[in-house]
Amino acid sequence: SYLTQALGLTVQNFVSAATGIAVLFALIRGFIKVKSSGLGSFWVDLTRIVVHILLPLNLVISLLLVGGGVIQNLKSAETVSLVEPIAVSAEGEILEDAVIDLDTETVTVDGEIVSNAQIVTEQFVPMGPAASQVAIKQTGTNGGGYMGVNSAHPLENPNAFTNLIEMISILLIPAALCFTFGSAVKNKKQGVAIFMAMFLCLVVALGCIAVTEQVGTPQLAQNGAVNMSMAEQAGGNMEGKETRFGIAGSSTWAAFTTAASNGSVNSMHDSYTPLGGMVTMLLMQLGEVVFGGVGCGLYGMLAFAILTVFI
């Protein structure tokens, strides 16, 4: 139910994000405190992070998503009538150019009656508090999605505006924590250096994914999986991608979500080209150091930096 989701999943989404930031601040205090006997109270840090950072931030993002068309309600799922009926085969495939006679409930294709075809006149539309759940799943690098197909669903991510907001939310806190680190250790150049190292890795990965998805491969072109560019479509490997996002929006999300250990998707990464899919897996296998999860990405990068200094 919506209540169990709010009490279970949503609470854990906030707590998991706050935990990563709290651990990071304990590490930062270990760097800057010399004569102190402690590293602060974890529970105080956790409460402050949730109340002063995560709740206000996600309230704003939720309102932006609702304004962009993401659903946010407590209604049960609805069944609505289609504008016009469609015919599907016994295997569930839509029959193109089918002539439907609702009076006799027959389906005709190329002048022949399809006996096992079914006429669909209604559609199941899920409801619920999606916008608030999407906001924390992104800002907390929790991943997953409210709908089964994640942020590829038009009710969870309906247009380019919501897509932009959700993509920015993935890296918003991990990127900001780099500058927080520089400010905390009273050496902002350190924070900028770490941010630039992460950012350059992300840009290279994003460029590789975008180029390979736009160009495709000869094998995909021969099989008809790579669409030719048209006025309404930029072309490229559009298999597993939403036309409202295209190659650019899908590739950017793929790079961001795998760099930040987020896990949410707006396209199916299994359908990417071999090189494009390889880069997404490489970002995951780097161990959450290209921005990474909230808090844990930065202290992972700091661990690598410390090892590098001594090795």
What are these regions (language model features)?
Residues 1-311:
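Membrane-proximal intracellular helices of multi-pass ion channels
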